[in-house]
Amino acid sequence: GIDVRLYSPVVRVSDGAVELANGDILTTETVIWTAGVKANPIVEALPVEKDKLGRVVVDEYLEIPAFPGVIAIGDCAHCWDARLNAALPPTAQVAIQQAHCVADNIMRGLRGEGEQPFVYRHRGDLVSLGAGDGVGEIAGMAFSGLPAWLLWRSVFLVKLFGWKNRIRVALDWIISSLFQRDLAKLEW
């Protein structure tokens, strides 16, 4: 059975047990942690409009309306997409596209050209589930298993900066597939 405990802060996770703030101890073999994240304290302290997650509200140029010329992107930015009628999720895919837009607009400004608004283009989703397994969706087509895992790894390598890093990561993956991980447990 699955025991879902909402609003039950965990104070300790040990081998085979989870202790809650109210003193309950749950014996278990598997723990799945689905906790949220908190906004960066610097972002929290900014005197600007924020959403319920603490993200700074930005306009279509990724600028903070109260501070023209000041830009917020990535996890700290609440970026509304009118086409989706929703805020964009705080994902790497969104952040990378925002960074490209900001860089392009800086270059446009240096050339005396006008800025272009940020337009998000969803490229799909890929998730590695480990050990040759994954799930994905690209252009409305869902797939899973080894093909999804291989595509995830391929995209990961392509997105790395520089050939040296790509080769190091690929070699690490090859070595890891040939040999078991060397784990050491420290007891105090």
Predicted regions and their residues:
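Flavin-binding catalytic cores
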Residues: G1, K38, Q97-E113
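A conserved beta-strand/loop element that lines the FAD pocket in flavoprotein oxidoreductases
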Residues: G1-S14
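Conserved beta-strand scaffold positions in the cores of enzyme catalytic domains, especially
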Residues: V4, V70-A72, L126
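FAD-site-proximal beta/loop scaffold in flavoenzymes
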Residues: G16-E19, G23-Q97, D104
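C-terminal, flexible cofactor-proximal segment of oxidoreductases
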Residues: D104-W188
